[in-house]
Each structure stands twice: as structure tokens, then as C-alpha cells.
């Protein structure tokens, strides 16, 4: 007769906490593993995911010099005059999405020099 996984799980569920800790210690010794190592490995990727690598550049407002902002948008995005004008007039609007931090900061600087209000997310 073979013991199923459900039978083992039910038996562990009926044990006290101290008995479960003792069982884990015995399993670690028998199989040469450590339960703490699995926790440390699982925590590693979460820290790496926190570092943001892609940014969105959002045009929040056009300021006083609309023509200069349109020119800056055209230069940065490669849009035609009408498309750039429509984009600028529809502010707040996303200009570029998923760009690197350096590209986002350069675009923000160029647009702010033209008089636009820009946000990098």
C-alpha cells in the first residue's frame, strides 16, 4: 500500500507547529537540503524587478510658445506637421512610451527648452 500526497498533507495538517518544525529539520538532514535556501532564491528576482528600465514621456502642457513645442515634438517623434500639432493640442498626451532613461531625459530637456511642461513616468 502506498501513501498518497493527500494522506501526507492531512497528517501534517493535524500535527502541532513544533512537530512540523521537527519534521522539516529531519527532512533537511535526510535529503541534504535547506528550507531557508528556497526562500532566499525566491526573494532575489523581486528586487531586480523593482528597477525600472523603460519610461514614458508625457506632454502635460504646451506653455506659451506653441510653435516651438510643435517643432520639438516633430523632431523627437518624426511626426508630420499636422500630426505633431494635433498631438501638442491634445495635451496631456503620451509622446513616447517604453524609452530608456537617457532618451526620456533628453526628450524632456528638449521639450522644456521649447517651453513645454513634460513628465517622465
From Swiss-Prot:
Annotated GO biological process: translation
GO cellular component: cytosolic large ribosomal subunit
Keyword DNA-binding set for record: no
Entry's Gene Ontology molecular function annotations: mRNA binding; structural constituent of ribosome
Coiled coil: none
Function: Forms part of the ribosomal stalk which helps the ribosome interact with GTP-bound translation factors. Is thus essential for accurate translation.
Family of the protein in this entry: Belongs to the bacterial ribosomal protein bL12 family.
Complexes and interactors: Homodimer. Part of the ribosomal stalk of the 50S ribosomal subunit. Forms a multimeric L10(L12)X complex, where L10 forms an elongated spine to which 2 to 4 L12 dimers bind in a sequential fashion. Binds GTP-bound translation factors.
Protein's recorded name: Large ribosomal subunit protein bL12
Source organism of the structure: Proteus mirabilis (strain HI4320)
Gene behind the chain: rplL
Amino acid at each position: 500500500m502506498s501513501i498518497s500526497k493527500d494522506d501526507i498533507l492531512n497528517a501534517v495538517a493535524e500535527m502541532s507547529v513544533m512537530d512540523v518544525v521537527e519534521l522539516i529539520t529531519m527532512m533537511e538532514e535526510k535529503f541534504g537540503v535547506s528550507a531557508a535556501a528556497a526562500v532566499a532564491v525566491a526573494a532575489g528576482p523581486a528586487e531586480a524587478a523593482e528597477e525600472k528600465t523603460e519610461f514614458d514621456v508625457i506632454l502635460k502642457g504646451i506653455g506659451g510658445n506653441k510653435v516651438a513645442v510643435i517643432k520639438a515634438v516633430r523632431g523627437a517623434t518624426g511626426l508630420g506637421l499636422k500630426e505633431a500639432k494635433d498631438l501638442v493640442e491634445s495635451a496631456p498626451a503620451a509622446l513616447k512610451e517604453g524609452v530608456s532613461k537617457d532618451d526620456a531625459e533628453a526628450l524632456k530637456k528638449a521639450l522644456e527648452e521649447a517651453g513645454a511642461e513634460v513628465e517622465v513616468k
